[in-house]
């Protein structure tokens, strides 16, 4: 059963999304609760599946991953049973999503070189046709999900002269 999160729970989740290493005392101060209360709330949020894990965000270039790409793959239905275990075992696949549209899968991948990427794409073509986009730059990194105001900002129109 879905449980509604109160303002304090939402603020705790928001703070942990920004910095999962934030000390309990800091969180407690920001939500005006005691550290034991915050600890109990975090435990409950984990138990209820609201918080599903904690990760370090790592700079791929430090590990010489210079190529980041998104690959669309149209998996042939008869190949899906063998595709899922294969893709799960590929460490260079950061994320793989089943999507709607012309392609059935969208993957985010990292590689050291374009030739490694090319070799991987060749392997993927065993499962179906691909379309690849290599990332030049990233304007918005992965971030936490929005918990507050989710209205899309309105662009101000320039006045016509």
Please place each PLM-identified region on the residue numbering.
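A compositional/biophysical signature of low hydrophobicity enriched in polar/charged and small residues
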Residues: 1-161
């Amino acid at each position: 059963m879905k449980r509604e999160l109160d303002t304090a729970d939402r603020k705790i989740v928001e703070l942990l999304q920004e910095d999962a290493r934030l000390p309990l005392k800091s969180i407690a101060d920001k939500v005006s609760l005691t550290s034991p209360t915050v600890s109990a709330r975090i435990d409950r949020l984990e138990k209820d599946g609201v918080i599903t894990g904690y990760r370090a965000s790592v700079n791929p270039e430090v590990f010489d991953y210079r190529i980041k790409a998104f690959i669309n793959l149209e998996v042939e239905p008869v190949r899906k049973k063998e595709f899922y275990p294969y893709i799960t075992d590929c460490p260079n696949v950061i994320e793989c999503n089943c999507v709607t549209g012309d392609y059935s899968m969208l993957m985010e991948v990292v590689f050291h070189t374009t030739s490694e990427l090319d070799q991987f794409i060749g392997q993927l073509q065993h499962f179906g046709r691909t379309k690849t986009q290599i990332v030049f730059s990233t304007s918005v990194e992965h971030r936490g999900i929005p918990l507050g105001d989710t209205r899309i900002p309105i662009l101000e129109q320039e006045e016509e002269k």
